[in-house]
Structures are given as C-alpha cells and as structure tokens.
Regions:
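Membrane-penetrating hydrophobic segments
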Residues: 1-2, 25-28, 94-99
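A generic alpha-helix surface/boundary motif
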Residues: 7-8, 38, 82
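Residue-level signal for alpha-helical transmembrane segments in multi-pass membrane proteins
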Residues: 10-18, 86, 111
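Transmembrane helix-loop junctions in multipass membrane proteins, especially transporters and channels
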Residues: 16-23, 49-54, 117-121, 142-147
Length: 150
C-alpha cells in the first residue's frame, strides 16, 4: 500500500513547498479517495469476516508470501489500487496516466488472487469500491475544497 499513500502524500508535500494550490487540491482529492475507500473496505472486512482462500482450502491453494491477519472480503490492496488509479485518471485524463494506472491496479488484483490471499469476488468488490469512492469523491471534494481553500 505504499503507492496509494505515497503518491498523494508526495503531491501534497510538493504542493505545500511550491505553494501550488491547484496541485494541493488534486492531492487532497486523490488522498481522500484512497482513505475513504480503504475505510469502507476495512469496515466490510470485519462485518463479513470471510476466511482467506489459503486457510479455507489449504489442500488446493498454497500461500505465496506471508500470511495475512485480516479477513479476506473485500481486498484492501485492490481497493486502494483502484481508488488511486481512478482518482489519478479523473484528475489527469490523459492516456499516459489512465492506461498505466489501470494496468497497475488490475495487476494488483490479479497478484492478490495469484498469491492465494483473495477470491475473485474479493478483488472485484475491492475494485468496485475503489472506483466508486473516486467518483463519489468528485462531489465530496467540491464541498471539501470550499471548506479548506475558500
């Protein structure tokens, strides 16, 4: 989860140093999209408390990497990746932002399934939450920008 936190944080720090209010607004939008999505995901994880695939089916699914301690549904890594990719794509609607960020977010989801830590439904739900939060946050940030910047 380094990139979903690091990118908006770095943008915000740079914006503050350069006194660039437009970039700071972008950083706030991207950062709050990720925070909202991850917050919703962790609430759902504990509400559903779904066992991880490698725990439920140890004879069929072999864990790659370290064991996870949180419940499986939905995928937090996928949620954060899609929230970041979507909010970056909304903020900077250029093919050279949209294509790599979408490929990266999809890669995160596939990797989580390949590692045996998530079911496809965990990843699809995480992706939907991430994308949804970024789009909803367009409207939330209109209000937030008035509070923070006016």
């Amino acid at each position: 989860m380094i990139l979903p936190v690091g990118i908006p944080t770095a943008m915000g720090i740079y914006a503050l140093i350069q006194k660039d209010q437009a970039l700071l607004k972008d950083a706030v939008f991207i950062g709050t999209s990720v925070i909202e999505a991850v917050g919703i995901t962790y609430g759902l994880k504990h509400a559903f408390n779904r066992q991880r695939p490698y725990d439920k089916h140890p004879d069929k699914i072999h864990l790659v990497g370290k064991a996870e301690s949180s419940p499986s549904f939905p995928s937090g890594h996928t949620t954060a990746a899609f929230a970041l990719a979507t909010s970056l794509s909304i903020t900077y609607p250029k093919w050279y932002v949209i294509a790599p960020s979408a490929l990266w977010a999809c890669g995160v989801g596939f990797a989580r399934m390949n590692q045996g830590v998530h079911y496809p439904s965990d990843v699809l739900t995480g992706a939907a939450i991430g994308v949804g939060c970024a789009f909803v946050n367009v409207y939330v940030n209109k209000w937030l920008n008035k509070v923070l910047f006016e």
